[in-house]
């Protein structure tokens, strides 16, 4: 779901606590400014069966302006992955080639590691992670999903 809110201190905490107080898990949460000053957009991914109840509770919050349940058929979603992979002289070329073929950007390469950045759907990031797993993932982090509707 996408939530348009006033960009005020404590809004994120109130939204997150409203969801967690009801016993719902937040699978992904991303917040950022919009093209309208003083407004932020939250993209929250939670269990499907809880969306209607969550929307009702969030609509009661003062700083919430609009809530949209995103239709997967009419939504573009994206997230970013940073992943640090173990490499050596024998594997460096292979790892970098696989990353390039996957559309990842090489951010840093050291003697025994390489860091890549990939932007894409959750499925694409998971596929890339599985591709590099045999080489040894040292560290990785993913942002929360962001999404925008393609049709109004």
Which role does the model predict for each range below?
Residues 2-152:
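Long, contiguous binding/interaction regions
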């Amino acid at each position: 779901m996408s939530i348009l809110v006033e960009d005020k201190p404590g809004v994120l905490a109130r939204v997150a606590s409203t969801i967690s107080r009801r016993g719902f898990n937040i699978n992904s949460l991303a917040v950022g400014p919009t093209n309208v000053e003083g407004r932020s957009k939250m993209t929250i991914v939670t269990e499907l069966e809880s969306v209607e109840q969550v929307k009702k509770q969030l609509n009661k919050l003062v700083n919430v302006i609009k809530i949209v349940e995103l239709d997967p058929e009419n939504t573009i979603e994206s997230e970013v992955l940073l992943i640090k992979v173990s490499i050596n002289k024998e594997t460096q070329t292979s790892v970098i080639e696989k990353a390039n073929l996957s559309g990842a950007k090489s951010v840093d390469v050291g003697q025994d590691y390489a860091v890549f950045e990939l932007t894409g759907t959750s499925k694409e990031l998971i596929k890339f992670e599985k591709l590099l797993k045999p080489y040894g993932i040292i560290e990785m982090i993913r942002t929360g999903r962001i999404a925008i509707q393609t049709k109004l």
